[in-house]
Amino acid sequence: MLKITIITLGNKMPDWVNSGVNEYAKRFHDGIQIKLIEIPLLRRNKSSDLARILEKESALIKDALPANARLIALDMLGKSFSSEELALKLTQLQQISSHLCFIIGGPEGLSNEILSLCDERWSLSKLTLPHPLVRIILLESLYRAWSIINNHPYHK
């Protein structure tokens, strides 16, 4: 069984975000387990020490990292994939690890410390995306790749 953990920073999401995440998570067959870990976003204001906030959030992310998982940071400077390339990449990753962990940062992204812990950096887009939407786009992209691998009609 392939486990996919998504660690994300954020506070209570709107219902449409939760609905989108749940919709794609339930589409995967029994051989894939999806787990979402939501770490509360620390409060920010105009006088916030953003470096200190990033450091604290990094510690929370590190505490949530699953053991023996392949760590993949979502980062604007990461590698991007077409749907077909992502399907091939997932096939390759399943031969390396039975547990993939995707990490989505907060408004300032991920710290260098977290990025250095990751095995890979992926980008979903060159655009800056709202972090709640990234959850849905990631799951849809993974589901589309899964459908390509399994010749499921979703991708057609």
Swiss-Prot record:
MF terms in GO: rRNA (pseudouridine-N3-)-methyltransferase activity
Record SUPFAM superfamilies: alpha/beta knot
Localisation: Cytoplasm
Major place of residence: cytoplasm
Catalytic activity: pseudouridine(1915) in 23S rRNA + S-adenosyl-L-methionine = N(3)-methylpseudouridine(1915) in 23S rRNA + S-adenosyl-L-homocysteine + H(+)
Gene Ontology annotations for the cellular component aspect, listed alphabetically: cytoplasm
Pfam families listed in its UniProt record: SPOUT_MTase
Enzyme Commission code: 2.1.1.177
Binding of S-adenosyl-L-methionine, residues: 74, 105, 124-129
Classification via HAMAP family: 23SrRNA_methyltr_H
Role this protein plays: Specifically methylates the pseudouridine at position 1915 (m3Psi1915) in 23S rRNA.
Classification via PANTHER family: METHYLTRANSFERASE, RIBOSOMAL RNA LARGE SUBUNIT METHYLTRANSFERASE H
Subunit annotation: Homodimer.
Protein's recorded name: Ribosomal RNA large subunit methyltransferase H
Gene that this sequence comes from: rlmH
